[in-house]
Amino acid sequence: MTMSNLHPGFILIAVGLIALFVPKSLRRPVLAAVPLLGLGAVLTLAPGTNATLPFINGITLHYLHVDALSWIFALIFCMMAAIGGIYACHNSNRMEAFCSMTYAGSALGVTLAQDWLTLIFFSELMAATSLFLIWCKKTPASRQAGYRYLLVHMFGGNLLLAGIFLKVSAGDYLVMPLAQGPWDTAFWLICLGISINAAVVPLHAWLVDAYPEGTVTGSVFLSSFTTKVAVYCLIRIFAGTDFLIWFGVLMALYGACYAIMENDMRRLLSYHIVSQVGFMVAGVGLGTAMALNGATAHAFSHILYKSCLLYTSPSPRA
């Protein structure tokens, strides 16, 4: 495997594993420097790159597929992992370092996957590692929020898994756009599973409940990946699905109204995530080239400015 087709997600997962076992004196340089290799790997990926791996029953896993859409999301995810790694250098919690990097690597795994099996594997790994990021705060509130987060994402993950099972059973192994139909059971199961991750109203309560309960580092990683990976999946699979316009508008208005009424800075920013993701979802629903480019650009910039806001709001009250 050359640098030109090295999976950046694998690099970040390796960083997490290293951080889990090395002493703190070595963990800091690992978190600060090694994620930059992932960023370098993204920069060397050429459009059209497609790495595969043989699987059971003649199935081929397309675990590294690069086009313009996957590349831009992979770029911002690696940038965020590198920035977050530098910020996390002060942290003595090795489990948080492991989960944050594995979480980011899993997000890249979903982004660069071209087949359903790879997508669901990394999606579930994202859910597991993000759960432990919430629990890393080790407070009663974070434990309770984590259990609720677990229940919601188990439900959403099972919906997504059931939809993917139907697609794979029908011989459809590759991730393809579904907006043009048929709007069958698999369509609705996959759409609902991804919508939960995108915090589409009324499936959004887990975000406002869980994100404020994480550590500062954990909250920044949480805000950067789960909903944005879901937006990527919506663009990839459901672009032009009309009803997403109305859900996006509802999210934008609902999140903004509740953010105005909040006096807890973390909860305010969590509602603001719902609102801003609503604009992205509405763009996906419109489905035009300009709307999809706008949703992608908004996701890119939102990760950057939201992380800055969360880095500067460690206190529980504004």
Language-model-detected regions and their locations in the chain:
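A short, hydrophobic C-terminal helix/tail in secreted or cell-surface proteins
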Residues: 314-318
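Bulky hydrophobic/aromatic packing residues
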Residues: 12-15, 63, 72, 104, ...
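Transmembrane helix-loop-helix hairpins at membrane boundaries of multipass inner-membrane proteins
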Residues: 1-98, 172-173, 177
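Hydrophobic transmembrane alpha-helices and their helix-loop junctions in integral membrane proteins
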Residues: 83-94, 101-119, 128-313
